[in-house]
Amino acid sequence: MALSAAEKSAIVKEYQTAETDTGSPEVQVALLTANINKLQGHFSDHKQDHHSRRGLIRMVNQRRKLLDYLKGKNVERYASLIQRLGLRR
């Protein structure tokens, strides 16, 4: 269910703002979105997996907090990230 190291590094390379950037809000939101999308596929097969559902809800909340932070700091970066990730906002 977790992302492999290769998947993580590909996402980091795509969304990083500098060569050594691995912790910017954009990278963190992109990684959380990939994990969330992967878990949603898991729940189509395992509807009763409430333990993992709790983890999914935590990830969604963390992503929301990071997006709110980014929106407060720089609206242009926020809008660009939302569009690139295909989130509904």
Curated annotation (Swiss-Prot):
Cross-referenced PROSITE patterns: RIBOSOMAL_S15
Q: Name one GO molecular function term.
A: rRNA binding
Q: Name one Pfam family in it.
A: Ribosomal_S15
Q: Which UniProt keywords apply?
A: Ribonucleoprotein, Ribosomal protein, RNA-binding, rRNA-binding
For whether the record's keyword set contains Nucleus, the answer is no
Task: Tell me the Gene3D superfamilies matching this sequence.
Answer: 6.10.250.3130, S15/NS1, RNA-binding
- Which Gene Ontology cellular-component terms appear in the entry? cytosolic small ribosomal subunit
- Name a biological process GO annotation: translation
Q: Which domain of life is it from?
A: Bacteria
Q: Which family does it belong to?
A: Belongs to the universal ribosomal protein uS15 family.
Q: What does the UniProt record say this protein does?
A: One of the primary rRNA binding proteins, it binds directly to 16S rRNA where it helps nucleate assembly of the platform of the 30S subunit by binding and bridging several RNA helices of the 16S rRNA.
Partners and quaternary state? Part of the 30S ribosomal subunit. Forms a bridge to the 50S subunit in the 70S ribosome, contacting the 23S rRNA.
Entry-linked PANTHER family: RIBOSOMAL PROTEIN S15, BACTERIAL AND ORGANELLAR, SMALL RIBOSOMAL SUBUNIT PROTEIN US15M
The protein depicted here goes by the name: Small ribosomal subunit protein uS15
Q: Which organism is it from?
A: Saccharophagus degradans (strain 2-40 / ATCC 43961 / DSM 17024)
Higher taxonomy: Bacteria, Pseudomonadati, Pseudomonadota, Gammaproteobacteria, Cellvibrionales
